[in-house]
């Protein structure tokens, strides 16, 4: 097996581990209601004829907000994203409320609150409190990225051993 093939194998393993651990984190963190984000996670490894590698990861756009979080107007997180003056649309939580099985409750006066009222309350809460960072992708990427130089060095080491065996 050539050096390039070994490095390609290491890069493929890196991509698979990051995606597998990210999906696991989504499921464990109960952030996998619709499975859209889970199914959108993937990676592309491009190998040029010159031997250069390019590895890119893909996910739904809202995955960045789930991963890094969003600061609300009242609660701040260490994130580049924040709500300032525009609330998330209440209609965005319609299907989410149904999938989560949230039922309308009664208010202080005993009146039933509708699903639309519940959606508005959730949107308002997210606007004020933000979205807590889950690091479902960042954490596994960081861990595997720190291991990557060692794995690549091992791939080169194996080819060096094979080279030395051929010389003898």
Where are these regions (language model features)?
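Charge-rich, low-complexity N-terminal segments
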Residues: 1-46
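Charged, low-complexity interaction tracts
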Residues: 36-168
């Amino acid at each position: 097996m050539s050096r390039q093939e070994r490095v390609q194998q290491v890069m493929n393993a890196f991509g698979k581990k990051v995606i597998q651990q990210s999906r696991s984190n989504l499921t464990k963190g109960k952030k996998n209601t619709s499975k859209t984000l889970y199914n959108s996670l993937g990676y592309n490894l491009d190998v040029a004829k010159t031997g250069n590698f390019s590895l890119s990861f893909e996910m739904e756009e809202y995955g960045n907000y789930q991963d890094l979080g969003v600061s609300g107007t009242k609660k701040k997180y260490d994130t580049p994203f924040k709500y300032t003056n525009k609330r998330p649309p209440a209609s965005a939580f319609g299907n989410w409320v149904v999938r989560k099985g949230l039922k309308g409750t009664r208010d202080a006066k005993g009146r039933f609150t509708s699903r639309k009222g519940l959606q508005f309350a959730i949107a308002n809460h997210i606007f004020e409190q933000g979205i807590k960072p889950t690091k479902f992708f960042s954490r596994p990427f960081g861990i595997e990225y720190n291991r990557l130089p060692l794995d690549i060095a091992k791939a080169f080491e194996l080819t060096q051993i094979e080279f030395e065996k051929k010389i003898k």
